[in-house]
Every structure is written in C-alpha cells, then in structure tokens.
Regions:
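N-terminal alpha-helical scaffolding segments that mark the starts
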Residues: 1-56, 623-624, 628-629, 658
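Buried hydrophobic core positions in alpha-solenoid tandem helical repeats
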Residues: 10, 108, 457-461, 503, ...
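Alpha-solenoid helical repeat scaffolds
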Residues: 25, 65-68, 334, 428, ...
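Hydrophobic residues within the alpha-helices of tandem HEAT/HEAT-like
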Residues: 34, 73-80, 125-133, 181-182, ...
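Extended alpha-helical scaffold segments
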Residues: 39-469, 608, 626-627, 643-652, ...
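Extended alpha-helical scaffolding regions
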Residues: 260-264, 282-283, 288-312, 336-339, ...
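Eukaryotic alpha-helical solenoid repeat scaffolds
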Residues: 397-434, 467, 475-478, 519-523, ...
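Short inter-helical turns and helix N-cap capping residues of alpha-solenoid HEAT/ARM repeat scaffolds
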Residues: 426, 456, 461-472, 476, ...
C-alpha cells in the first residue's frame, strides 16, 4: 500500500473506536506514517488528527493511551534520525520520508493545534524530545532543541493552569510526560516550570488512581491467603498478587524514582510554601491508609519477622512474600525521598523556619515516617542516607520546641498502659515511639518526661521475658536508651533520684540474658556520669553513686563464686561491629564496670574505690579474663579519661601507695632478702618514699 493510501486509511480509522487488535494496528500504522511521510503538511495533519481521534482517546485505559502516544512519537523520532544518518552515508534511494530531524520535529509541533488540549500536546512534545535527544543522541540543532524544550514547558504550564470554567487537565498525563522529559530539560527550561501547580498534580498522580491507588492494593491480599498444613500460602497466580505485579508495571509506578526527583525539584523551587504543607498532609493521608490496609485487612500483619519461616510456606517466602516487600520498599524509598526534599527546603525557607511552622513541618514528616515504619524497620531498611537525614533532621527541629515535642509524643503515645501489646504492628509503632522519645527530653518538663517517656519505657523494662525475639530485643534496648536520655538531662534530677535505684536493679536483672557486656557497661557508665559532678544530683544525693558501686562490687563477688558467672560469655553477634572481641564473663564485665566508673567519682571516695577495684580485678580466676581487665585498668589511668585532679591522685596511688602491686599482683610482694635472712644479720630499715 502506498504511503498516501495508508494515510487516508488511517485517518478514516481514527473516526471510530475499535477492538484491541485493530487499535494496535492503528498504532503501528501511525508510527510508520510518522516515519515515512515526506510532506511536512501531511505530518502536521496526521498529528492534529491523532490528537482528536476517537479511535485513540475513546479507549477505557486513559493512562495507557497516553503512554502509547508518547511511545509512537518517540519511536518515530528515533527512526527519522536513524534514516537521516543512513541517507547521509549512502547515496541512492532515501530511507524514510527524507526529512531531516529539525524539519520533522517542526512539522510535528505544528500539528499540535487548537483543536486538541494542551496536555495532549505535551504528550507529543515529550515523544519528540525523547526520541531525538535521549541516550545522548543529540539529533536536533541547538535552536530546535530549545524550541522543543520550550514547547514542553509551555504546554505543561498551560495544562496545569486553573482556567475556570475550563476543567483542569488530568494530573496523570501531565506528570507522566514531565517524568520522562525532566532529565532532558536544560536548567533554564526547568526554571520556567510552574512548580506551585506541579506539586499538587504530581502528588495526585503519584498517590492516586494513576499511581499507587491510595494503598488499596494491600487490602485485597488477605482474601487470597490460604492455610496449607499448619502454614499459610499466598499463590503467585492469585488475583491480589497479579494486581500488584500489574501495578508495578504502571508507567508512574515503575518510574517512582524519577518521579520523586521531579517532585523534589518542584519542592525546592516552589514559591508558595502552602503547597508544601499540603503535600505533607497528602503524604500522611496516603501512608496512613497504607498502614491501615496492612493492619486491618491482612492477617499476615500478625507475624513477626522471626515467625515468618514458621507460619509461611517456603514457596510463599521466596515468591510472593519477597515480591510484596520488595515493592513496598520501593514505595517507601519514593515517599522518603519526597519527604527529604521537604525537610531540606524547611532548613532554608524563612517561611518554613518560623517558630510556629518549623515544628509542624517536622512533626508531619515524623508522622509519615511512623506510618512507613512497618516497612522501614524490616532488616535495616531505614539505614540509607536519605532516610537518616530526613529522620534525624526532623527530630533535631522538633526537639527545640518543648510544647510541640510533648504534643507530638502525646499524639502517638502507645494506648496500652503497663502492658506490652499483643499485635506485632503495635509493637513496631512502640519501637518508633521509643526511638523518637529518646531524642526529645531536653526541652520537656520533668512531668512530661515521666509521663511520656519513662512510663512507656518501663513497660518494656519490667515485662521482658527470656528469651527475647529480635523485635522485643530492639524494644528492650530502646526502652533503656529512652530512660537514660531522660536521666541525662540536668533538669530531671527529681525524676533521676526516684528512677535510678529501679533502673539499676533492672540493669542487673537484665544482664547477661537480655543485654550484652558492652550495653551493660555503657548504661551503667552513663548512670554514673549522671550521678557525678557537675550534675546537681551529685550535690543533693552524694551517696547515691557510691551505693550503686557497692551493688556492682557485691554482684561481682557473687558472680565470682558462681561457675556460670566465671565462665566466658558467648561472643556477640557478628553483625554488631561495636561489640568487643575480647573474652568476657559476667564477673569480669562487672569489674570492668567498676573501672569504667572511676573517672566520674567524687574526689573524697576516688582513691578508696581504685583500691577496691584493684582487689576485684584479682578475684577473677581466669587468667585470660583477668588480663583483659588489667589492661582496661591501665587504659583508664593513662588514656586521658580522668581530669587533672583525678589523674594526679591516680598516679600517686599507682606509684607510691601500692596501686601497681594491687593491680598486677593482688598484694605488695615480699622482698627476697626478707624471705631468706642469715642468722644474726641486721635487718634493713624500710625506706620512705622520696617523692
């Protein structure tokens, strides 16, 4: 069929809606015509008619149609450029229509006329720019490329503009086109984008029906979960999983990474800060729905990570289960990337830095991260740099405002009073709560610290059972950290006096079953710092620190009489790089704890406790464990951990008061000449120190 007859036939087919097979033929014929037409007027006519053709736009899947239109012009542009290069190399019959890239692009752009909508023009311009310039093809001249870029930006801005009573352009196609072209636009072209209008449109496209469907895809999983021989199975061919795989193939979902970068650029360059606050509300609403669908509509949410291998079939774990969490992580990465742009903007924008706005931005960001924590808390998924910046910066901002911090903690405080929740998701939220609370006590009044931090943490300190699951271990450690953060604040001295005895007893009862030697030593060292100068509690309750030391020394002596207390403890998990590699027992750890506390003791008891610690060192029977403790004793003396006064006392004690002998030998050794003396010999008088 000649090219002119094909053009006539395609223009006729444009007038009616057809079945899928005929529609695919129309797409293919249109691509062939765009590639081979030699008359620019025919190119413009074909483009103009395509943009109003019922055969194209009468299809039910609008986003798929938009994607296909972009694909048509992208493919045609690639072929036109390829034909142009071939024609330049070989003389003879011309390949294609014979038009150069600039002339072809100009003819196509003219076809985007007033009969069609601006957002439809944007799809055409996107296909042309992608086909000519992506992959470093550099097909267009500098002037024509600037023209096409300007056409893309102008069409996008006009499509996004609110122009009553004309209905606003659908957000999905505009966002899809800009998502494809953003990386190809020059800085000057990007600067012309209407970011204030782009943010709500891109957010709607990303989170709504054209993108992540408001998280409803999670709600259908429970229907397809079946029980098979005391385990649950979720088949790969189930409707819910097939829907998720189809969802991943959506253009906007498969391009979540570039889309988050597009939104990030718009956030950084928007003029109206209110659209950023509205964006945060949209993110909170979406992540809240995602969490609710997972919690309410899915029985699999009742499984802890450590229980998955028990209750799920191996095929489910390696198939649908892994695929689901992989997709959820992609969603989480995109949401966090957008939140990171908001947080970065809030550090520079004076309107977002105001005292009545900054804590609101930080709290909204933390609400979003809390809703995503059931995803980000799996297997260290929250350890990437963008997440840490977003999380820690929001905490730093919120912690400066005591009232806002208290209000935020009150809003997300665990509902269960004094009992550990049964549902794993609730425990996950408690873990997020404790991790956040650890950073906020500095500007909270003592009453708020007690109510909002100490009491929720005590729930996990007093109800810990052995052995702990990995998640319960995280909660237990976070509860310790939260309590220590409260005790470390000088203004919380009234709470410290009441809590320290209870907390010390909790430490002793938890070690070594629930906390490692390093964790025990660090926690006790922190408590000793809190009870020592310059903290005010050191003056009001000077006996408290020494009482705790007596408890440690007593526990060490008890452990020395117990074979289990003398035996080396199991090595820490290899995944924890902070754990010491030297062998330790319960007894040696307690003695090391005594030594760690020495630099913080008051001067009037400092020397006495050095002697007591030295005696405790030599009560350790295992020589290898004892040598580890001796090295630590020497390290405390010489490493600069002590201030000038304590260091001077320590040097004198080591050199002239028997400290060296007490540490190294357990007692001052007898002189050889006193052990063997000739009968009738004169004894040598003791020489005093000349120092």
């Amino acid at each position: 069929m000649s090219i002119d007859r094909l053009l006539t036939k395609v223009l006729e087919l444009y007038q009616d809606v057809h079945d899928d097979a005929r529609t695919e033929q129309i797409y293919g014929s249109t691509t062939a015509l765009l590639t081979n037409l030699s008359n620019p007027l025919n190119l413009s006519l074909l483009t103009s008619q395509l943009l109003i053709a019922p055969a194209i736009w009468g299809r039910p899947d609008a986003m798929r149609t938009c994607y296909r239109v972009i694909s048509i012009f992208n493919s045609a542009a690639i072929h036109v450029r390829r034909n142009e290069l071939e024609n330049a190399k070989h003389k003879g019959p011309r390949a294609g229509g014979g038009l150069g890239s600039d002339a072809w692009a100009a003819a196509v752009l003219k076809g985007a006329d007033g009969q069609s909508n601006r957002w439809q023009h944007l799809l055409v311009f996107t296909g042309v720019l992608m086909g000519m310039e992506s992959g470093n093809r550099n097909s267009l001249s500098g002037g024509m490329r600037r023209t096409v870029e300007r056409a893309v930006v102008t069409a996008a801005n006009l499509a996004l503009r609110k122009n009553e009573p004309v209905p606003q352009a659908p957000a999905g196609p505009v966002t899809l086109a800009l998502n494809f072209t953003f990386s190809l636009l020059s800085e000057s072209s990007r600067a012309s984008l209407n970011c204030d209008a782009l943010i709500p449109a891109a957010t709607t496209a990303m989170l709504g029906a054209d993108g992540l469907e408001d998280g409803y895809f999670l709600g259908a999983v429970d229907i397809d979960v079946r029980q098979a021989v005391e385990r649950f199975t979720w088949e790969p061919n189930s409707p819910s999983y097939l829907h998720i795989t189809q969802l991943e193939k959506k253009p906007l979902v498969s391009g979540l990474g570039p889309l988050s970068r597009l939104l990030g650029y718009a956030i950084q360059n928007a003029r109206d800060s209110q659209v950023i606050l509205q964006l945060q509300d949209d993110l909170i609403a979406f992540t809240g729905k995602l969490f609710q669908h997972w919690q309410v509509n899915n029985k699999l949410s009742e499984l802890e990570i450590s229980e998955e291998s028990i209750y799920l079939t191996p095929e489910t774990i390696s198939g649908t289960w892994e695929g689901l969490w992989s997709f959820l992580k992609k969603v989480m990465y995109a949401i966090v990337a957008v939140s990171q742009a908001v947080v970065a903007r809030s550090l520079l924008d004076w309107r977002l830095k105001k005292h009545d706005v900054a804590p609101v931005v930080a709290a909204k960001t933390l609400h979003t991260l809390r809703n995503l924590y059931f995803i980000s808390s799996r297997n260290g998924s929250d350890s990437f740099q963008v997440y840490q910046f977003t999380y820690l910066t929001s905490l730093d901002t919120l912690s400066r405002f005591g009232d806002a911090s208290a209000a935020f903690l009150e809003e997300i405080k665990p509902n269960t009073e004094g009992t550990i929740p049964f549902h794993p998701l609730h425990r996950t939220l408690d873990l997020f709560y404790l991790n956040v609370a650890e950073h906020l006590p500095l500007h909270l009044p003592p009453e708020a610290c007690d109510k909002l931090i100490i009491q929720p943490a005590i729930t996990y300190l007093t109800n810990a059972a052995a052995p702990l699951s990995p998640r319960m271990m995280e909660l237990f450690e976070s509860a310790h950290s939260a309590v220590l953060s409260v005790l470390s604040c000088p203004h919380n001295a009234p709470i410290t006096v009441k809590i320290v005895p209870f907390y010390a007893e909790t430490l002793f009862s938890s070690f070594p079953k629930h906390i490692s030697p390093r964790q025990f030593r660090l926690a006790f060292k922190t408590v000793m710092q809190i009870l020592s100068p310059p903290f005010p509690i050191a003056a009001s309750h000077p006996q408290l620190a020494e009482t705790l030391l007596e408890m440690v020394r007593y526990r060490a002596s008890i452990a020395g009489q117990d074979p289990n207390g003398q035996a080396p403890l199991p090595p820490p998990p290899a995944a924890d790089p902070l754990e010491a590699q030297e062998p330790m027992s319960e007894q040696s750890t307690l003695v090391l704890t005594l030594i760690d506390a020495l630099p913080f003791l008051q001067l009037d008891i400092f020397e006495d406790w050095m002697t007591l610690a030295a005696h405790a060192v030599n009560e350790i029977r295992d020589s290898a464990l004892r040598e580890v403790v001796k090295r630590r004793f020497w390290e405390v003396l010489v490493s600069g951990e002590m201030d000038v006064e304590r260091a001077a006392i320590g040097v004198a004690w080591w050199g002239t008061k028997g400290g060296r002998e007490a540490v190294l030998f357990g007692r001052a050794p007898e002189r050889q000449e006193e052990m063997y003396m000739m009968s009738g010999a004169l004894s040598r008088p003791e020489r005093g120190s000349k120092l």
